[in-house]
């Protein structure tokens, strides 16, 4: 393997061993690529990946809940499969009947690996990334796969910037998702990102701290559940702790915890099993 191969391998697996299915998993899930035509992005086709759980093909009348997963920046959708190994977690937990199966959907939230969109609706009408996820991707997945096409069967999660995106999208669309997870996400949009331009009003409209009190009555009524964590030395720890306090003040069900460490892939890998179980336990099943 040459230098380029080593670099590609590291970027794909982040220094961890490649995923390997346990021997007892006789019917692993399948990974599919989906192109979504997105009105929210000016009609462009945007890539997403879908992981269908073990047994999906063998149970043609069964419907499945969906967990939408948003990558960080810089990032790519397949990091959830290659690095976090959520596909193997899905197969392992469902094969041993420790958790119900989920369809995993991983959209690509940018126009390139190093272009930053924060999973939010920007100034340009061709840069409405929150609507891309909550409308275009959700509609495409519901149309093509045997999902539970309601909020009761949908969760949204993300790591790092994707964690911010998951919470921000859920607050903008409080009737679309019943479970919201943030893995080391932040709670304040970055004012230096070009997506929002110089519009302070747009920044405020994408600030979860300001959004939460406005939509809290809807979240309480629907029982939307927030599950999120931060590393003990993560620079976003205080933001997350404050957000947990506000959720408690608003009477919204949630679980927030801190794990030892910083803002690392090791934390996200080690917490992925618990994240999957938290979603699978609360999402409706067909």
For the regions a protein language model found, what residue spans apply to each?
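Non-catalytic cap/lid and distal C-terminal segments of serine-dependent acyl enzymes
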Residues: 1-286
